[in-house]
């Protein structure tokens, strides 16, 4: 009876053995196990069969122990799936996105198999693990953010990186060929050493900046004669690239000592799709030829912007020759002259406004047509609209506002804003219409000297109860506006004057103002798509005020 109980007890002892708290997969990977049963979280995510083995005895095996226990302690079976998981953990730790440990912690995991005498170190050249990044200068993370809140931080980071000089080169973000054979391995090593030298990125304290405006403030800084046609391939002075180099998905544009930065989606996609390519991508250099400008420049201006004419030498050779590399826009972003053209229109408007002499009506109409055409071209330009440049869009709105101010001066000088053919039947009707018009949004805006001294008077006369055509007496002598020289109107040998001339001007200017309102509305809709950014939000509010101002004038003329 006692013997049977002993056997039962021995059997119970075999069944009720202790189970380890960590599963076999987590124990072999040396990571913390979630201890969920029957399947832990790690094994469930990786699709493995979770096994919780019995607890092994601690300490050294006894000499008198069985052979099975000795074999268990001295023999370790290498599971290739566990080794692959360990390699993935180390790769994630190197790249900084490991979910099992600290990004900066590098662990050496070894497996010893006494049967085969195999020793594997996971930090060696294990297949599938990308190499460690080089020790060269690292671009700050703030440069990867293109939001308006970080414009100043990005600008300071660019000044810390410094400005480099070099010939003009257009590069692409595809795998690049190796350096030329005639340069030899020595030149490639010199190139590598210069690229990883932090002293080659020292900022130039005398570098001029155009970061705040987004376009060249000084129009006389370059002596090139740029064409304004849309088919022209010449770039405006603010966006002339000098050389190209891609690093970590960023594009740098060199503009007379300053650098502009914008993310390149192609480089970012290539970095996320293939880490091996991204780790070695910044070591590659472009060998594409440089662009030849269409315009003729002097030697001094060409040297100031770094142009080399029709040179087709590889970029790597010029980089090793002593010049630094500067990053430019990719080939798909062709240079445009929208900003330069709009600045020329603004300069011409400013010159006519500052001039004390009278401005002719035909010149105002010409400037109005050029401004609207250039604004439409900017709205369809990929570089101006799709690359999130709010400054050129805000500049277009300001130029349109200046044109509206000149057209408004014509209306005031000929009393067209106070001229009405309204037919009233009672004082009540005219009073209600007058109150509704005065309550409409009238926002005077524009440069100094062109603002309205007071809101425009009502086009309805409260004292008029007859059905006759009346003309309100509006005094323009006290208004500090611009004098407009109206051209004569001739129909053959007959000169159109008097009320007929006023009706013609009213019809002409109303049509022009409606076209301007439609252009401003289209510009407002384009900027309203990116209203979450501060610069676009400010531009949207400004264009809304200009649009309401133009609509109020058109509504007054339609009465």
From Swiss-Prot:
A GO CC term attached to the entry: nucleus
Low complexity composition bias: residue spans: 222-232, 286-316, 462-477
DNA-binding region per UniProt: 23-50
Comp. bias regions, Basic and acidic residues: 268-279
Swiss-Prot/TrEMBL keywords: DNA-binding, Metal-binding, Nucleus, Transcription, Transcription regulation, Zinc
Polar residues bias locations: 255-267
Stored InterPro entries: OAF3 (IPR050675), Zn2-C6_fun-type_DNA-bd_sf (IPR036864), Zn2Cys6_DnaBD (IPR001138)
Source organism, top-level taxon: Eukaryota
CDD domains: GAL4
Biotech utility: Phomoidrides A and B (also known as CP-225,917 and CP-263,114) are potent inhibitors of Ras farnesyltransferase and squalene synthase. CP-225,917 and CP-263,114 inhibit Ras farnesyl transferase from rat brain with IC(50) values of 6 uM and 20 uoM, respectively. CP-225,917 inhibits squalene synthase with an IC(50) value of 43 uM and CP-263,114 with an IC(50) of 160 uM.
Region (Disordered): 166-316, 453-477
GO MF term (any one): zinc ion binding
UniProt subcellular location: Nucleus
Described purpose of this protein according to its UniProt entry: Transcription factore; part of the gene cluster that mediates the biosynthesis of the antihypercholesterolemic agents phomoidrides which are dimeric anhydrides. Probably regulates the expression of the genes from the cluster.
Protein name according to UniProt: Transcription factor tstO
